């Protein structure tokens, strides 16, 4: 009898245990697949020097939607157009916020800019200002003369090298071009000396973007943020922010003095700072802009505008050197359309159909920010049957999506002709090509960036024939990528220019 009672008790206990175990399993959320992770650091060691490439390799093993544990931060990686559309369109509102990072908080005044501000009323109002006042088509067109003048200066610098046959550092010249253009558009003027201008603007922009993509321990292990002080990263960030802050303060003070001296109330708006100062007094705005808010938005324009043009042009010229038949076809088009004029002007651009295909193909293979700007979920959501918790960081691998063989035939090849009779564009409606993102947090400065790229590339191809220095061939050109949130070529693009027009 005792044995039967004991067996009955064991049976009841085992049944209870199994029910509890099953209940626990049922309650466990169905998370996306994850690679094995290490204690404490999680999957950080699997990012590598070029995360967009490492993450594509992981996606090839585990699938297009994977969950990583980067230190203490759950991070979703999206690698196909279909899932990107779910994130950026179907559930855009849930994923419309941004994670707060060490660099963004410091550089952009506690994330009060447009790019890194959390989703909310402040962001909506400031983005509205940017879209309607700072980056509208009308405003972009009003800066045509600045773009043409800055491109003309670059052509003159390149022409000086033609007489000696020396190679030019095209990467450096393109950075000077983009920083000079954005400085005049945003601030109304630039320094006269080339070296001073380079040091003050191009170098500051380069360091800013480097820091935005740098590793800060506190971003992944909040309790250990003090380690960034020991490594020197905190001091480096403070130094860059201090220089940027002093520079933008000087720019704003200059504008205020000029307005006071001229008795201007802001009606005559010459540059982006003028527009912002005028809007600061507009009581109809849904948000008050203090001085730090102005500086955050100004730095957004400064950093974003500089990189988009320089990086895209650098990769476009490198691909054309690699594909001389494509370059020749583009040169023939530009020279036929422009004729014997001294330069390409913006009214010529609408006829340069092949050049536009080259730019589109360049952005497919070389998006400026391969992982875009990270997003963050504001509440729990289900994607493809997987539970995604609130406060999950999200990276969209635009680089991998642009090279997905399911979306693109011969995906790794540079073939501008793929876009002939193909309506796919990069403006955020076609998710197989999203170099500027999509949805609410898509880049509002596409028109400004592309207008600068088109006029610059057209003039480079119109004025000059290009080749590698010495006995180098196209096979010798190193297409390696540099490390950063925006991806330049690892080694500066050195080319020999030969004047086409005498």
Curated annotation (Swiss-Prot):
Tissue: Mesocarp.
Ranges in a coiled coil: none
GO MF entries: heme binding; iron ion binding; monooxygenase activity; oxidoreductase activity, acting on paired donors, with incorporation or reduction of molecular oxygen
Residues the entry annotates as binding heme: 443
Top enzyme class: oxidoreductase
PANTHER family: CYTOCHROME P450 71A2-LIKE (PTHR47955:SF15), CYTOCHROME P450 FAMILY 71 PROTEIN (PTHR47955)
Protein name as it appears in the record: Cytochrome P450 71A1
Organism of provenance: Persea americana (Avocado)
Source organism phylogeny: Eukaryota, Viridiplantae, Streptophyta, Embryophyta, Tracheophyta
